């Protein structure tokens, strides 16, 4: 079933178009990279749509506004965790903005898992969010494991019941290895496999 989706010309074209956008992000400036990081901070414990809308509400203010302003904007656009995420955005900006691309690029170019480990030092960034960020700036060797991917793996019999809200690091890596095996069998990168599964589960390619 998934193989036929991967081989579907229309779906494949849409997925590869999105992949090209991620590859362009890899060549983009620090502002684009920090925007992608902010999106991943907002996506944690929220839907992608909610996070994307919140990011658009914030606009360029992610680069300079204080915590109170960011909190107010998030609240006004009905983003749920406006207090916590405003704090995380400011903390991330103070910690990495201006050197994010410079520090992550050489790591990710040599070892994407090491780059992910580095990103875990940012408050609010977990395994999923770090993997999501790296995929969105053009690195495709890590899995973005959310409830959609877990539901998919459970349905095909690859895993049993799992509580996605309490996923340990070791369990995440174990699930990632399952997805990498599936991706290898389909001759695609696991970060690209994610887009096909996302499309299968949601009928969209917006991640």
From Swiss-Prot:
Q: Which reaction does it catalyse?
A: 2'-deoxyribonucleotide-(2'-deoxyribose 5'-phosphate)-2'-deoxyribonucleotide-DNA = a 3'-end 2'-deoxyribonucleotide-(2,3-dehydro-2,3-deoxyribose 5'-phosphate)-DNA + a 5'-end 5'-phospho-2'-deoxyribonucleoside-DNA + H(+)
Q: Which residues form the active site?
A: 128, 146
Keywords of the record, alphabetical order, are: DNA damage, DNA repair, Glycosidase, Hydrolase, Lyase, Multifunctional enzyme
Sorted alphabetically, the Gene Ontology BP terms of this entry are: base-excision repair
Molecular-function annotations in GO: class I DNA-(apurinic or apyrimidinic site) endonuclease activity; hydrolase activity, hydrolyzing N-glycosyl compounds
Q: Where is this site: Important for guanine/8-oxoguanine distinction?
A: 207
Keyword Hydrolase belongs to the record: yes
E.C. no: 3.2.2.-, 4.2.99.18
Task: List the Pfam families hit by this protein, alphabetically.
Answer: Ogg-HhH
Q: Which top-rank group of organisms is this from? A: Archaea
Q: What does this protein do?
A: Catalyzes the excision of an oxidatively damaged form of guanine (7,8-dihydro-8-oxoguanine = 8-oxoG) from DNA. Also cleaves the DNA backbone at apurinic/apyrimidinic sites (AP sites).
Q: What family does the entry list?
A: Belongs to the type-2 OGG1 family.
Write the protein's name.
8-oxoguanine DNA glycosylase/AP lyase
Q: What gene is this protein a product of?
A: ogg
